[in-house]
């Protein structure tokens, strides 16, 4: 089914391709006479800023299939035609050579309904001619792992017309198995216009993408670049960049063409019209990633040897990295018997709690990579497993068997623990907690100062400074615990959040200026404080954001504002009064950012997932000196642990737990098929705002102020803390402060 076409926005232009590609083309001012424009060799690259889980607001790009990116050059000199079929102003033999980009990928659509309508309007969509004279230079790996027949890609040379040569066409398979086509002008996908040059100097994955692409071009061109063992990535890139900027001499463009003597890997270029593709399992059972798209040949050989040794009782799983097969791991695998090497462990810490928009993990549960992922069919499970892990660890042919099963229960749901050499740990839930809280690479800090419990007669009300207060979750929990609050100073810039706190707590909260404008004089005037809490925005820290700026740029820098005011609020050393603090942020952050935060706060975080005390997943890191922060999380009798407990009358839940609820409306839909979680009067329905509030632990209609709509209320809740988790952390404060 062919879909309609549309032009991508600027945001989509940046994320339209997963891999970096090289183009040797020419620069020209299209507004001037082409015959007077000098031909200048340039290096242009198209690359997402972050290879791991590229994601934008317009398309869930995590599921892009392994893209086939090509270089197309006009050698006819006849000029190109625009999207409307009209001949451009440049024609004749003097027409400069213009770069054309072709990218084929598989992207799930969020809106199946419009796709059906677009399918009826695509008859006039221009396509490339089968007899097109434009040579295609494929810069993808020849040894890439072939796609399965259920992950089709499109062969542009078989289904095209000559019109529209100046556009990049992306054929994307929608979630329901249909196809939708996008067209975008190639000059809008160039690095010089769509990417930030500073990213090359700041982001290692960006430089690695450039290096891998240049390395592929160098091998094809037979170019020898001098290198020595131990050279850094920057040192290896320098001569290759000079060669590329010089026009790929001496072979030039011809040297970038693939070797015709090598057989074509047809399984990697299977077309959507291939009858074998139509016989495969439903495409929405599969999920494809760009991360893990690197050559894993050596790792797979190592893992195959490991699996063979363990099967023949010649080796021990705990002596190998379960993800890559290397020996002498530095840590244990939290879910399955086996270890993890340093690089795989860091990847786990960053990506294990990263979820896609359908609620499933973004990467494989075993290796946190995966080119093609298989999703568990259990509605309460968010696990997925990659084809490579199933073939190596469970057994050859397992992946194909799994694709034919519907429903399929993953290896975390099946009662049987052992499947080949993939053996689930008996205590995996405790191991998972330890894995995220005991990092051997983190510094060992001195234990926080302990404050003895104060006799009831000497306790006084608590004084709180709340930074990035949100919707006053801290104040709400303190009141629910019965702790008397003498003053509650809150820094918040969101008008809707301030409205909720002001109305629901009847003016008991004093809202102050932006945190960046608060000085030591203000702290001295408002204080002293007994409790300082806060959680800076996670936009530039979360691995979900492909263009995140990290801890030291963008909103990530606001952490240092918390650190600054925390130091201002700390009592003098000779003052023995109890003083507590807590800082919260997302788990799916880079390991380096986590360690930097711990280094400044001089303590390691604890990881708490709200799934233990509520009906939704919400894993977060908490730093602080609150008493008993690392104690086990236990649900109380009043906690609503299942979705049904949170629903209104006559509404039935389809599942017991829901995935992480974010500020995006589609995060409410569950599972690989994006199902509605509730049934009412025989019809599927989304969660109502009051039900979302119960899931987070808030009272009914807590966010129902100032005529806010459903979307605005969900955004407030999506940025908030889980009330039962904060109650768990604040409960020991009852031994130090007066209670009602």
Curated annotation (Swiss-Prot):
Phenotype reported upon loss of the gene: Mice are viable and healthy but show male sterility due to defects in spermatogenesis. Male mice show hypogonadism and azoospermia with interruption of spermatogenesis at the pachytene stage of meiosis I. Retrotransposons are derepressed due to DNA demethylation.
Q: What family does the Swiss-Prot or TrEMBL record give for this protein?
A: Belongs to the class I-like SAM-binding methyltransferase superfamily. C5-methyltransferase family.
Any single GO molecular-function term of the entry would be:
DNA (cytosine-5-)-methyltransferase activity
**InterPro entries registered for this protein in UniProt:** ADD, C5_DNA_meth_AS, C5_MeTfrase, DNMT3_ADD_GATA1-like, DNMT3_ADD_PHD, SAM-dependent_MTases_sf, Znf_FYVE_PHD
Name the PROSITE patterns on file: ADD, C5_MTASE_1, SAM_MT_C5
Explain the purpose of this protein.
DNA methyltransferase that specifically methylates the promoters of evolutionarily young retrotransposons in the male germline. De novo methylation and subsequent repression of transposable elements prevents their mobilization, which is essential for germline integrity. Compared to Dnmt3a and Dnmt3b, shows lower DNA methyltransferase efficiency.
Region (Disordered) spans which residues? Answer: 75-99, 248-312
Question: Which leading EC class covers this enzyme?
Answer: transferase
Cellular location(s): Nucleus
Q: Which organism is it from?
A: Mus musculus
Q: What Gene3D superfamilies does the entry give?
A: PWWP, helical domain, Vaccinia Virus protein VP39
The name on file for this protein is DNA (cytosine-5)-methyltransferase 3C
Please tell me where S-adenosyl-L-methionine binds in this chain: 471, 473, 492, 514-515, 719, 721
**Its gene?**
Dnmt3c
Record-listed E.C. numbers: 2.1.1.37
Q: Name one GO biological process term.
A: cell differentiation
Q: Which reaction does it catalyse?
A: a 2'-deoxycytidine in DNA + S-adenosyl-L-methionine = a 5-methyl-2'-deoxycytidine in DNA + S-adenosyl-L-homocysteine + H(+)
Q: Which superkingdom?
A: Eukaryota
How is expression of this protein distributed across tissues? Specifically expressed in testis.
């Amino acid at each position: 089914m062919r879909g309609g076409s549309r032009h991508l926005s600027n945001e989509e232009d940046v994320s339209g391709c997963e891999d970096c590609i090289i183009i040797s083309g020419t620069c020209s001012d299209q507004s001037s006479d082409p015959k007077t424009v000098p031909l200048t060799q340039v290096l242009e690259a198209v690359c997402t800023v972050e290879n791991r889980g590229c994601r934008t607001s317009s398309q869930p790009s995590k599921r892009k299939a392994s893209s086939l990116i090509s270089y197309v050059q006009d050698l006819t000199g006849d000029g190109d035609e625009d999207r409307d079929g009209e001949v451009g102003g440049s024609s004749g033999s003097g027409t400069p050579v213009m770069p054309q980009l072709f990218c084929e990928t598989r992207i799930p659509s969020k809106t199946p309904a419009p796709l059906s309508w677009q399918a009826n309007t695509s008859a006039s969509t221009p396509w490339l001619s089968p007899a097109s004279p434009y040579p295609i230079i494929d810069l993808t790996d020849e040894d890439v792992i072939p796609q399965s027949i259920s992950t089709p890609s499109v062969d542009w040379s078989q289904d095209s017309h000559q019109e529209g040569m100046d556009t990049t066409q992306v054929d994307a398979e929608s979630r329901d198995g249909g196809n939708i086509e996008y067209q975008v002008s190639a000059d809008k996908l160039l690095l010089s216009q769509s990417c930030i040059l500073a990213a090359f100097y700041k982001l290692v994955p960006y430089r690695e993408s450039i290096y891998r692409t240049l390395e592929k071009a160098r091998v094809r061109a037979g170019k020898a670049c001098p290198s020595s063992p131990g050279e850094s990535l920057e040192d290896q890139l320098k001569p290759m960049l000079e060669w590329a900027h010089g026009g790929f001499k001496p072979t030039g463009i011809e040297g970038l063409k693939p070797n015709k003597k090598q057989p074509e890997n047809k399984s990697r270029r299977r077309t959507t019209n291939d009858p074998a593709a139509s016989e495969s399992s439903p495409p929405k059972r599969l999920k494809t990633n760009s991360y893990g798209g690197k050559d894993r040949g050596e790792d797979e050989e190592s893992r195959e040897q490991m699996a063979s040794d363990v099967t023949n009782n010649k080796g021990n799983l705990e002596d190998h990295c379960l993800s890559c097969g290397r020996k002498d791991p530095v840590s244990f695998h939290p879910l399955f018997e086996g270890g993890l090497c340093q690089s795989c462990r860091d990847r786990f810490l960053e990506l294990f709690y990263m979820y896609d928009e359908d609620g499933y993990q973004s990467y494989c549960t075993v290796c946190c990579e995966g080119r093609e992922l298989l999703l568990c069919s259990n509605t309460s499970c968010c696990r997925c497993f990659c084809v490579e892990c199933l073939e190596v660890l469970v057994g050859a042919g397992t992946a194909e068997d799994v694709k034919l099963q519907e429903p399929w229960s993953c290896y975390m749901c099946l009662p049987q623990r052992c499947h080949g050499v993939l053996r689930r740990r008996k205590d995996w839930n405790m191991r998972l907690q330890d894995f995220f809280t005991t990092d051997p690479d983190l510094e060992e800090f001195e234990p926080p100062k302990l404050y003895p419990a104060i006799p009831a007669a000497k306790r006084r009300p608590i004084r709180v400074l709340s930074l990035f207060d949100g919707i006053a979750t801290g104040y709400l929990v303190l009141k629910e615990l019965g702790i008397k609050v003498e003053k509650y100073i809150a820094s918040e810039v969101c008008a809707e959040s301030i409205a909720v706190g002001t109305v629901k707590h009847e003016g008991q909260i004093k809202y102050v200026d932006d945190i960046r404008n608060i000085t030591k004089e203000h702290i001295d005037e408002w204080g002293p404080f007994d409790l300082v809490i806060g959680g800076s925005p996670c936009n530039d820290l979360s691995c979900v954001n492909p263009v995140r700026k990290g801890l030291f740029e963008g909103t990530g820098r606001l952490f240092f504002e918390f650190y600054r005011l925390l130091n201002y609020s700390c009592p003098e050393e000779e003052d023995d009064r109890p003083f507590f603090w807590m800082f919260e942020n997302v788990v799916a952050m880079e390991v380096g950012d986590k360690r930097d935060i711990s280094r400044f706060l001089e303590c390691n975080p604890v990881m708490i997932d709200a799934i233990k005390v509520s009906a939704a997943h919400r894993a977060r890191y908490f730093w602080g000196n609150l008493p008993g922060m690392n104690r086990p999380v236990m649900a109380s009798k009043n906690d609503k642990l299942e979705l049904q407990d949170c629903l209104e009358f006559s509404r039935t839940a389809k599942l017991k737990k829901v995935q992480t609820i974010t500020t995006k409306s589609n995060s409410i839909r569950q599972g690989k098929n994006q199902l509605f979680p509730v049934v009412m009067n025989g019809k599927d329905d989304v969660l109502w705002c009051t039900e979302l509030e119960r899931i987070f632990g808030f009272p009914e209609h807590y966010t129902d102020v100032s005529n806010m709509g459903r979307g605005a209320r969900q955004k407030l809740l999506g940025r908030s803390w889980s009330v039962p988790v904060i109650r768990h952390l604040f409960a020991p404060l009852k031994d130090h402060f007066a209670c009602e």
